[in-house]
Amino acid sequence: MKNIFIVLIFLFLSSCAEVKAQDKQHEEQQIIEQEPLQNNETPQEANQESINSANTAKSVLHNHDNNQTESVLTQDLHEQKKTAITTKVTFKIDNNDMVLGNKKSNVIVVEYFSPTCPHCAYYHQTIFPALKKKYIDTNKIAYVVREFIATKQDLDAAILARCKGDINSFIQFHNIILQQQDKWAYSNKYRELLTDIGQLGGISPEEYKQCLNSDKITETLIANTNLVAKAPKFIGTPSFFVNGVQTENYSIDNISRAVDRALEDETKSK
């Protein structure tokens, strides 16, 4: 009888231990589930914050990639690019635009570039000179250069180029920034290097600092970025819009074909 009683006590204690273990496991699970909901966040707020963070990361990655090499594009992206070239977006020249050529021309070419974009640097060094000679120097078109800001480096470099505010200074720094891209864009000391570039072009460190703190310049750059970011199927930088229609890529043949077509249409309409 005594042995039976001992066995019953043993079974009772085992059962209690198991219940306590289950309760502890349940509490730990609740804690784990509640960990993301810190700082008095609701589940909906926490979920939205995660979504926003993911979207921001995807946006920066997409914008800074800038790789338009055909071999890495999937079939879906090929289809998106085909759709993009038929999409028309309204672009009007405003007082903040940097314009080359004939401002009064009805054929407006808008280039979107990022100061840290390698393809943009390549375009300006190898393709742009021929287009400039054919269309800009002859005053056939209005050529608008707009920045697409994807990184802090892009912003600081674009501010330097716009610091003095005139077109000649802008082009001077625009060219130097792209030519020297590999020396400053990927350095931890990019701000110092941009400051040095500014001094060589006649902008003192104090002037550059004032421009960096200028809300007007920053707002212009962000507005330029937001405008094209809303364009359907925007394919990254460099991108070109001829009278609002995006070209397929930045080859001289594609851009020239689009410009010639626009000039022809303009002649017929007169």
From Swiss-Prot:
SUPFAM superfamilies in UniProt: Thioredoxin-like (SSF52833)
Superkingdom of origin organism: Bacteria
Keywords from the named record: Disulfide bond, Oxidoreductase, Periplasm, Redox-active center, Signal
Name of the featured protein: Putative protein-disulfide oxidoreductase RT0103
Predominant location category: periplasm
InterPro entries: Thioredoxin-like_fold, Thioredoxin-like_sf, Thioredoxin_CS, Thioredoxin_domain
The enzyme's E.C. designation: 1.8.-.-
SS bond partners: 117-120
Signal peptide segment: 1-17
EC supergroup of this enzyme: oxidoreductase
Species this chain originates from: Rickettsia typhi (strain ATCC VR-144 / Wilmington)
The UniProt record lists the keyword Secreted: no
GO molecular function: disulfide oxidoreductase activity
One Pfam family from the record: Thioredoxin_4
Function: May be required for disulfide bond formation in some proteins.
GO cellular component, as recorded: periplasmic space
